[in-house]
Amino acid sequence: MSQARTLHRLIAPAVEALGFELVGCELFRRGATTILQVFVDKPGGIGLDECAKVSRQISAVLDVEDPIRGRYTLEVSSPGLERPLYTANHYRRFIGNKAKIRLREPREGQRQFRGMVVAVDNEEQVTLQLDNKILKVSLGEIEKANLIADFEG
């Protein structure tokens, strides 16, 4: 299990106890600094004060459990307009929206695709309508995915 998944399982109860959805978390390095980026949401969106409240709660859990080796920076935010997509339910929620995905392994010589999310089946297979074809991929094949903000309406 990846460290991000372990952290997700560790902090999810604290986030949910405050009435928020833990959309996902990512652990990465930016220069010499380790960053734990946590995305939270609720119906109607989440504000800065609420992010601060969640941050304090997550910090308390992480201080007790100490799952990250060394120093790190905790960033808590809304998922934003180009929100990450992690689960089948995320894709289902945004059927009809444009997304960009990066696959773990190339398919037909390509790892990155942009298209409209058109379906998610019970086997967690995501279907995207690309410009000229349909792409079906399992969640396990997807390394990273985000919505594409549509400012044209």
Curated annotation (Swiss-Prot):
First-listed, main subcellular location of the protein, grouped into a coarse class: cytoplasm
Keywords: Cytoplasm, Ribosome biogenesis
Keyword Cytoplasm in annotation: yes
Any GO BP: ribosomal small subunit assembly
Locations listed in the record: Cytoplasm
Role: Required for maturation of 30S ribosomal subunits.
PANTHER family for the chain: RIBOSOME MATURATION FACTOR RIMP (PTHR33867:SF1)
Name of the protein in question: Ribosome maturation factor RimP
Organism of this sequence: Coxiella burnetii (strain RSA 493 / Nine Mile phase I)
Classification of source organism: Bacteria, Pseudomonadati, Pseudomonadota, Gammaproteobacteria, Legionellales
Gene encoding the protein: rimP
